[in-house]
Amino acid sequence: RGRIHGRRTSGELLDDLTAAVKKRASRQESALQSALRAEQWFESICRQLRRVQPAVQEGAAGEAVQGPLPQPSALRADTPLQTLDTFCVLALKTTGKHPGRDELVQLSALKFRRFAPETILTVSIRPEKGLTRYAREAGVTDSMVASAPAAAEVAASIEAFLGERAPLVLFQSEELAFLPAAGIGCAGEGRTVYDVQSLTGKPDGKAPTLAEACRDLFSFTPELGGTEQEALACGLVFCALCDRTLHLTKKSAAR
């Protein structure tokens, strides 16, 4: 049979398909390589953080800290840059969603200076009521808390690290209530709190997860295995939001 004019042979179609598959595979390989480089970059930052061990006051007793918590603040173009010179990012793991009933079992506080992560304090806390399925699903194990201090024994050390004035940054600001419930003061006079999930809200009104926020802003999703990784990821997302809102890159280039 002769070839019908205008139609392509099966061989030509196969060649085109093969070329398309190779092109797509090349793009996928490039994307994977980029994601791998981004993950390695993220892990290297995490390794380079200066780690602070909390002082443990054995036998210290405590009780819930009373008083209202600060409401989340907006991030605006006129937010004074000097107010963000130092801020602290908090990432928590708990035994449930209710501060009045559930307990804090792990905390990481990561201090940023001039939008660079510097120092991190991480501590596991022994829950009085024991671990729950909720905590285990979040990655907390019995071995992490078996010999951990009680919240009251590390409260003073955590409070000292947080200070009284530096803004606090959380992915979900309502989690801040777990600190005073555990006897850890965090609501100093004039304390500013930023809710990163709200600040990264999507146009459709859906609240992104931390992993989704990272993917949307950085085109990669870091491995969020513990509170240290979560605090770093949350802090980097917040820095990106500050850059977008306050035009930090342009201001730096203009100097």
What do these predicted ranges mean?
Residues G6-T9, D15-C88:
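N-terminal accessory regions of nucleic-acid-interacting proteins
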Residues F220-G225, A254-R255:
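Cysteine endopeptidase catalytic domains of the caspase/legumain-like
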Residues V193-E212:
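Short alpha-helix plus adjacent loop in nuclease-associated cores
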Residues K206, L224-Q229:
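Short glycine/threonine-rich catalytic loop with a Thr-x-Gly-x-Asp
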Residues L69, A74-G188, A211-P222:
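Conserved non-catalytic scaffold segment of RNase H-like nuclease domains
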Residues A182, D216, V237-R244:
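Active-site catalytic microenvironments for nucleophilic, acid-base chemistry
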Residues C242-R255:
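Mixed-charge, glycine-rich, non-catalytic linkers/tails in nucleic-acid processing enzymes
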Residues Q229-C239:
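Acidic, divalent-metal-coordinating active-site segment for phosphoryl/phosphodiester hydrolysis
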